[in-house]
UniProtKB/Swiss-Prot annotation:
HAMAP family: UPF0178. This is UPF0178 protein bll3966. It comes from Bradyrhizobium diazoefficiens (strain JCM 10833 / BCRC 13528 / IAM 13628 / NBRC 14792 / USDA 110). Belongs to the UPF0178 family. InterPro entries: UPF0178. Pfam families: DUF188 (PF02639).
Length: 167
């Protein structure tokens, strides 16, 4: 855990829960970087910054992956980006509320790659299910719990550090 404050990075181009992220972030006083390849409208608030990462295919993903670190939260449905951020130590949540973890990301990435191969071979024609109202609720709960967990880890780390310096 680092001493720099927690930040939420949003892979924003197709993110259906941006408004929910803003509400939770403002309630917790956590800064948000809304990263997109194109212009995207964000609320006027000092805690919310818009990042135009450029038009390159993975420009937004690269921008986020280069900055994500332990204590940060990344919101993305992009599985390769999620993998990079999990490896960097960030907490990663999909817009449907599903967490990507060190334990789950390998299998998730393998399934994604398999489905991509099957689609390109014409074996699978459907995609993921549609975003549902319950996904929004699950996401809100997951983001709030993740921010609380990070805050507890910071408090515990500070207490441990203080105790070891006294002992």
């Amino acid at each position: 855990m680092t001493d720099t404050p927690t930040r939420i990075y949003v892979d924003a181009d197709a993110c259906p829960v941006k408004d929910e992220i803003y509400r939770v972030a403002l309630r917790h006083s956590v800064p948000v970087s809304v990263v997109a390849g194109n212009f995207i409208r964000v609320p006027q608030d000092p805690l919310i910054e818009r990042i135009a990462a450029g038009a390159g295919m993975d420009a937004a993903d690269d921008w986020i992956a280069e900055r994500a670190r332990p204590g940060d939260v990344v919101v993305t449905s992009d599985i390769p980006l999620a993998s990079r951020c999990v490896k960097a130590g960030a907490d990663v949540i999909a817009p449907n509320g599903k967490p990507f973890t060190e334990q789950s990301i390998g299998m998730t990435l393998a399934v994604r790659n398999l489905m991509t191969d099957l689609r390109s071979a014409g074996e699978v024609t459907g995609g993921p299910r549609s975003f549902a109202p319950r996904d929004r609720s699950t996401f809100l709960s997951a983001l709030d719990q993740t921010l609380r967990r990070i805050q507890r880890r910071r408090i515990d780390a500070a207490a441990t550090s203080q105790n070891s310096s006294q002992g």
